[in-house]
């Protein structure tokens, strides 16, 4: 990275918020964009961000798979794969699971357990049974792997789903252990009043049933990339306390296919909490934000009369030269205007491909792009706000499920600049600043980070239940 390393650090540390954007001019992506709504249906979430030293591998590390498969062989222990089973396989997680299974078979793994979280994309029990049968057929074919945990998932912040995760966590740490149920049993536990995704949790966990328990020197791989569920789950496993008061054996080896570069966050930021971290970075005049948007880049520079001159780049159709084109547009536009906001494509969407090789290649391109952006902005002394795909989907109008997901967390942002904040007009005369005018545009950014609002001296709407990092 460049001298400040600020982008990479914040990408590893912070969650973020989705920016709701005006539908006009946005590239339609499959059936994700509801043309009757100003909101987008985006299937993404916070990446896995473990910060224990022993969880120190990412898919960009060439030794990742060597260590992953060597551990269970060395200790004559089990390999456990944890991830989501989805009807539409939107992120290709099942393809990755199958590839991991084949690699494990080739490396001589003899005991492999699969722990599945079933998302709410399945609308009928036949659809779920078919997907489970497809996976079972594959494991039978290669003669490796068994599904030992099935749990439902929906919105993590609902109590019913916390019980699902307690069921899955119990499989890791002992106490009440997880009973493996057949697909038919899982489906029969469904709460018919609330729909198929509301699986009754209490019958999933029973005392004395040891099948599939994770313990000792076992190795765990989280093969899912994109759900804030997994950040929540791994943090509960890693820190071994909090909601469930559970602890994991120190000998347990945990790996993740996170698209973030796993690092020693505490050594980078010795501050005790996020506010201290924020203040620490602020003193260096490099403050804040990361937000998210789907598979296109959204380059938003300001014109002199505060009208937006957007540049849309369709990621799907520009995969080969996407980052070069984006960087070129950034350079050509950023020097013309006082303030530039760049929303790069979601990290999950931008890098995840149907093979590990392509995914690693895309990940490397992505981080090279971040390095180039950082270097350019700091060299040119530009005032620049970078938003990226890192975080929970908050305040998103989910048309399919008619559900509003509330914002629970503070949302940071990144301002890259060598300017002093007062000279950049971020805190003086906010009512006349370009930022104030921009943020008040109708049908543009409908939901912005509380921290960003406070930084610009603007009121935080009651609709944002998250809090500013400056508080």
Per-range role (PLM):
Residues 1-471:
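Feature captures the catalytic ectodomains and active-site-proximal regions of enzymes
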């Amino acid at each position: 990275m460049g001298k400040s390393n600020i982008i990479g650090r914040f990408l590893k540390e912070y969650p973020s918020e989705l920016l709701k954007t005006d539908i006009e001019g946005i590239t339609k992506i499959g059936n994700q964009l509801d043309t009757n709504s100003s909101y987008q249906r985006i299937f993404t979430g916070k990446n896995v961000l473990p910060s224990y030293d022993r969880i120190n591998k990412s898919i960009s590390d060439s030794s990742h798979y060597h260590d992953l498969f060597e551990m269970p062989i060395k200790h004559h222990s089990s390999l456990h794969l944890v991830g989501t089973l989805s009807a539409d396989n939107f992120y290709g997680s099942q393809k990755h699971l199958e590839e991991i299974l084949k690699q494990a078979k080739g490396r001589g793994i003899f005991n492999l357990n699969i722990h599945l979280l079933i998302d709410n994309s399945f609308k009928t029990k036949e659809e779920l049974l078919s997907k489970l049968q497809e996976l079972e057929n594959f494991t039978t074919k290669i003669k490796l792997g068994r599904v030992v945990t099935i749990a439902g998932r929906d919105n993590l912040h609902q109590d019913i789903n916390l019980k699902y995760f307690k069921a899955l966590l119990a499989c890791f740490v002992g106490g009440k252990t997880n009973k493996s149920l057949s697909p038919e049993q899982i489906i029969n536990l469904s709460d018919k009043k609330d729909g198929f995704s509301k699986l009754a949790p209490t019958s999933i966990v029973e005392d004395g049933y040891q099948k599939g328990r994770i313990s000792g020197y076992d190795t765990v791989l989280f093969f899912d990339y994109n759900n804030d569920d997994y950040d929540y789950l791994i943090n509960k496993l890693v820190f071994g306390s909090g909601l469930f008061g559970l602890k994991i054996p120190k000998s347990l080896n945990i790996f993740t296919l996170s698209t973030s570069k796993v690092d020693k966050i505490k050594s980078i930021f010795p501050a005790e909490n996020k506010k201290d971290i924020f203040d620490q970075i602020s003193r260096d005049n490099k403050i804040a934000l990361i937000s998210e948007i789907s598979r296109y880049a959204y380059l938003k520079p300001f014109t002199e009369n505060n009208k937006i001159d957007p540049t849309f780049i369709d990621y799907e159709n520009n995969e080969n030269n996407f980052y070069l084109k984006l960087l070129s547009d950034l350079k050509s536009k950023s020097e013309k205007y006082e303030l530039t906001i760049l929303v790069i494509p979601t990290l999950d969407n931008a890098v995840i491909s149907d093979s590990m090789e392509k995914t690693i290649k895309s990940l490397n391109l992505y981080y090279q792009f971040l390095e180039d952006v950082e270097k350019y902005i700091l060299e040119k002394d530009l005032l620049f706000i970078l938003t990226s795909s890192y975080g929970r989907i908050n305040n998103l109008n989910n048309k399919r499920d008619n559900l509003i997901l509330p914002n629970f967390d503070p949302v940071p942002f990144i301002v890259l600049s060598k300017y002093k904040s007062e000279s950049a007009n971020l805190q003086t005369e906010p009512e006349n600043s370009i930022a104030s005018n921009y943020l008040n545009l109708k049908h543009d950014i409908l939901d912005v980070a509380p921290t960003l609002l406070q930084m610009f001296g603007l009121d935080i709407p009651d609709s944002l239940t998250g809090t500013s990092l400056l508080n």
